[in-house]
Design a protein with these regions (language model features):
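A short His-aromatic
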Residues: 109-113
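Conserved helix-to-beta-strand junction in the class I
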Residues: 123-127
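Conserved N-terminal segment of class I S-adenosyl-L-methionine
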Residues: 1-100, 104, 108, 118-121, ...
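Surface-exposed loop/turn segments and immediately adjacent short secondary-structure elements
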Residues: 140
Length: 181
């Protein structure tokens, strides 16, 4: 019997997207991962902020995927979804997780939640050949529904975006759908 989960509780009041195996996934999420699938370099892939692991289903099946999230409950969910033999999930903080070398690191809608996001991007760059990042930008208030993001302002200001670009990464800004620079 499949374990049942309270999705609203796991989403932490719209703080994260959570989809279980077999759920339909929002087009916005799907678009991000389809973009990633076409831009993955190599076979060894790390995803920071993997949530329930739903993004794995859109990525090439021949990759060695590691998903990382700070929320132990969501990692339990990811492990129970049985996404695939090549998918491993870990509960850890990116600030202290011992990073290996990866071909590609994915961080979708994560950097803006970190107090030291720019430092983390610098750290990630040292451990991969290809870094795929998306950040929210110009989303209308309430785009994700009433009370989205606990009414926090997560949209990145121009200075932060310029700082990210100065780190010479491949960055996507999420306007209604990803626009890549």
């Amino acid at each position: 019997m499949t374990k049942q989960y309270n999705i609203r509780e796991l989403e932490n009041n719209f703080e994260r997207a959570v989809f279980l195996k077999g759920d339909s996934v929002h087009a916005r999420e799907t678009t991000r991962y389809l973009w990633a699938r076409n831009n993955i370099f190599g076979k060894k892939v790390l995803e920071i902020g993997c949530s329930s692991g739903y993004g794995y289903q859109f990525l090439p099946k021949d990759i060695d995927y590691t998903g990382l999230d700070y929320d132990s409950k969501i990692i339990e969910v990811a492990k129970n979804q049985q996404w695939g033999d090549n998918a491993k999930f870990y509960h850890a903080d990116i600030n202290t997780f011992p990073l290996d070398q990866y071909d590609t690191i994915i961080a979708f809608e994560v950097i803006e939640h970190l107090d030291n996001g720019l430092e983390i991007v610098e750290k990630l760059k040292k451990h991969c050949k290809w870094l795929l990042i998306t950040v929210p930008h110009n989303e209308p208030k309430g785009f994700w529904g009433v009370g989205s993001y606990n009414d926090q302002e997560l949209l990145l200001d121009k200075g932060y975006l310029i700082a990210l670009l100065n780190l010479e990464i491949f960055l996507c800004l999420n306007d209604a759908f990803a626009k890549c620079i």
